[in-house]
Amino acid sequence: MDFSFTEEQVLLRRSVRAFAEGEIGPHVMAYDEAQEFPHALVKLAAAQGYYGVLFPEDLGGAGLGYVEYVIVVEELSRVDGSIGISVAAHNSLCTNHIFACGNEAQRKAYVP
């Protein structure tokens, strides 16, 4: 079995790392010292599609798999654990339940 990352996964890792280091990293200490939740950074991450990694494109998601999801969470968490866990919680704990168990109207309203 080959456990190597695909070319697309390597590119995703580079892209998320560049985003995290460039857009999130410079602000981490300010949010931490102010003891504030980084709402603005969450919006930036959402605009990149990270809050919909696992969900189909027809519902506004990226249509990617769990390996890609872990890459996104890992790279975001390298720079700021709060953003990484926020993305993980949204994809796994919240939206995934609506996607799996909700009706079509709920999916269209709340996913991703």
Where are the language model's segments positioned?
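Intrinsic disorder at enzyme termini
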Residues: 1-8
